[in-house]
Amino acid sequence: MNAERKYLVLLAPVISEKSTMVQQQANQFVFKVARDATKREIRSAVEKLFEVQVLSVQTCNYLGKEKRVGRHVGRRSSWKKAYVRLAEGSSIDYGVA
């Protein structure tokens, strides 16, 4: 993976009640990732950007929701989420206040 691609794979951390619970119980961190990203690319990007050891990566594809404004029907973009399990002692600080 080239240097630019690792910055395009991880789009944002997913911060929710479920992701916080999974983080505390299983040392897993949740990210919104590019739809065309593979598990190998996600693993490589997390290891290089955060300098941690990744044990496993699980991904989920989500279809965009259909939204309506008056008579007009539109659709939100589909997206992909990755659950990244880190080795014991490894952690990621999102920098959230």
UniProtKB/Swiss-Prot annotation:
Cell inner membrane in keyword set: no
A single GO cellular-component term on record: ribonucleoprotein complex
One annotated GO biological process: translation
Key word Repeat present: no
InterPro entries, alphabetized: Nucleotide-bd_a/b_plait_sf (IPR012677), Ribosomal_uL23-like (IPR013025), Ribosomal_uL23/eL15/eS24_sf (IPR012678)
Signal sequence coordinates: none
Coiled coil residues, start to end: none
Keywords of this entry: Ribonucleoprotein, Ribosomal protein, RNA-binding, rRNA-binding
Example of a GO MF term: rRNA binding
Pfam families with a match to the protein in the record: Ribosomal_L23
PANTHER family recorded: 60S RIBOSOMAL PROTEIN L23A (PTHR11620)
Function in brief: One of the early assembly proteins it binds 23S rRNA. One of the proteins that surrounds the polypeptide exit tunnel on the outside of the ribosome. Forms the main docking site for trigger factor binding to the ribosome.
Assembly information from the UniProt record: Part of the 50S ribosomal subunit. Contacts protein L29, and trigger factor when it is bound to the ribosome.
NCBIfam families: PRK05738.1-3, PRK05738.2-4, PRK05738.3-2
Family: Belongs to the universal ribosomal protein uL23 family.
The protein, known as: Large ribosomal subunit protein uL23
Organism in which the protein naturally occurs: Acidithiobacillus ferrooxidans (strain ATCC 23270 / DSM 14882 / CIP 104768 / NCIMB 8455) (Ferrobacillus ferrooxidans (strain ATCC 23270))
